[in-house]
Amino acid sequence: MGEINRRNFLKASMLGAAAAAVASASAVKGMVSPLVADAADIVAPITETSEFPYKVDAKYQRYNSLKNFFEKTFDPEANKTPIKFHYDDVSKITGKKDTGKDLPTLNAERLGIKGRPATHTETSILFQTQHLGAMLTQRHNETGWTGLDEALNAGAWAVEFDYSGFNAAGGGPGSVIPLYPINPMTNEIANEPVMVPGLYNWDNIDVESVRQQGQQWKFESKEEASKMVKKATRLLGADLVGIAPYDERWTYSTWGRKILKPCKMPNGRTKYLPWDLPKMLSGGGVEVFGHAKFEPDWEKYAGFKPKSVIVFVLEEDYEAIRTSPSVISSATVGKSYSNMAEVAYKIAVFLRKLGYYAAPCGNDTGLSVPMAVQAGLGEAGRNGLLITQKFGPRHRIAKVYTDLELAPDKPRKFGVREFCRLCKKCADACPAQAISHEKDPKVLQPEDCEVAENPYTEKWHLDSNRCGSFWAYNGSPCANCVAVCSWNKVETWNHDVARIATQIPLLQDAARKFDEWFGYNGPVNPDERLESGYVQNMVKDFWNNPESIKQ
């Protein structure tokens, strides 16, 4: 039998077998996982593309990082008018209750404001004050928001807050952190901090020394360099790694650093913050200090022009994410943010010791998702996150820019966009209704976008003001869209089922149901997740299970 005829025969056979297999949850889980995997490879093969896989209009302009939800917080202009949603009432679009439209008023009431909704700045600072532990959440002492849960969250975020410069919000160039000097003769710690570089450190002073001594490591080829760098990146802590070519389209058009000012804390120490926390806590309102702005000049701030970007992914804990929107789910996000800085710093040191320049970055400096797509790590999903084949959206992305020329990976397609068109589970699970219910992505025009979105690229609309408003109300980040995602599994056969479902007309309408039949993820409805006791039970399971569920 010829190869083409054999393939067609196998495809037809696999379609029938796979359709029968996915009809029985127990059969799939216990007996026919290899069959499903084989079927997926034939029915929905993984493909590589040489070009960026999504449309980018000629009108596209680089994204201004100061427009993202958290960076916009520190623009004093954002504190003058109520926060604005792109759609005032999404029930007119979805036909379902808009669970997010009242959040600005509820958040204002938390701040003691009567008669108007909260501003963008008030909304974000309400979240950040609770997130830092300086203000109790409204669910304080409920299961998932207890002092034990909050302490775990604080520990998980500690490196990001204390040693990374809180670049989770964006920023650049590099990071700056306040540290308290210690007198080595008396062991006394100063009350006033000094500003020093954080883990996202762009100091490349050692590189020239290595080169001048003739010690720069020479790889035999770009391919060998990529192989060695990827191996090192995994050893240094990354779960997934890919190489993207440097693409200026994804570098922010403006870099910015939050202006920090000294605030006297109740313990007498001085803490440098981008908002006046004591004033807020005493009922004096929310005051922010703005940004220092920088042109994105690589040579000026990092000493080199990038040629390659090492993009890596860190897995988030499956059990912790299941507890969303509890503080436990925030803790695994914080752990990944803390680890992002550590791993990126170690990769940068590795490159510098080889005699190559490096700039380690988290969410700052450039757009991580399109770089990760270019690096072959996954596809962009409905929820705006990178969907990887192994972890789905349950991860965080960081990157290291370098002047070492590496052989780039290619973008990969494995059925995510086709599945997202059919599923819409993340949109249904969002408490703020921030995720589009439209079936297909499109090249967004300015009128389709809220202020934090960049038009002229192909994607689904997201309203970060709605998302951020729920975070403020919840007192903690929300990961519902990650928790319920059909790609968020620890058994990869489920991903194969998802790929197959997008290719079989009889199964397409049931695509999102498969993992629900198999007992994953809990309720999709955000109110039901809490009211049914599901979240509380997942929190108890998290604390009572001594071993983490691993991929």
Swiss-Prot record:
Record text on cofactor binding: Binds 2 [4Fe-4S] clusters. The corrinoid is probably a cobalamin.
Gene3D superfamilies to which the protein is assigned, alphabetical: 3.30.70.20
EC number(s) from the headed UniProt entry: 1.21.99.5
InterPro entries linked: 4Fe4S_Fe-S-bd, 4Fe4S_Fe_S_CS, RDH, TAT_signal, TAT_signal_bac_arc
Keywords: 4Fe-4S, Cell membrane, Iron, Iron-sulfur, Membrane, Metal-binding, Oxidoreductase, Repeat, Signal
Leading EC class: oxidoreductase
Membrane topology: Peripheral membrane protein
UniProt note: pH dependence: Optimum pH is 8.1.
PTM annotation: Predicted to be exported by the Tat system. The position of the signal peptide cleavage has been experimentally proven.
Domain annotation 4Fe-4S ferredoxin-type: ranges: 411-440, 478-496
Subcellular location: Cell membrane
GO CC terms of this entry: plasma membrane
Cofactor(s) required, per the database record: [4Fe-4S] cluster; corrinoid
Residues that coordinate or bind [4Fe-4S] cluster 1: 420, 423, 426, 485
Record's signal peptide: 1-39
MF term (GO), any: 4 iron, 4 sulfur cluster binding
Keyword Oxidoreductase in record: yes
Mechanisms controlling activity: Activity is inhibited by ammonium ions. Photoreversibly inactivated by 1-iodopropane.
Reactions it catalyzes: trichloroethene + chloride + A + H(+) = tetrachloroethene + AH2; trichloroethene + AH2 = (Z)-1,2-dichloroethene + chloride + A + H(+)
NCBIfam families: RDH, TAT_signal_seq
Subunit structure: Monomer.
Function: Catalyzes the reductive dechlorination of tetrachloroethene (PCE) to trichloroethene (TCE) and of trichloroethene to cis-1,2-dichloroethene (DCE). Can also use trichlorofluoroethene, tetrachloromethane, hexachloroethane, tetrachloroethane, trichloroethane and 1,1,1-trichloro-2,2,2-trifluoroethane. Menaquinone can act as the electron donor. Reduced methyl viologen can act as the artificial electron donor.
Family affiliation: Belongs to the PceA family.
Protein name: Tetrachloroethene reductive dehalogenase
Organism: Dehalobacter restrictus (strain DSM 9455 / PER-K23)
UniProt lineage: Bacteria, Bacillati, Bacillota, Clostridia, Eubacteriales
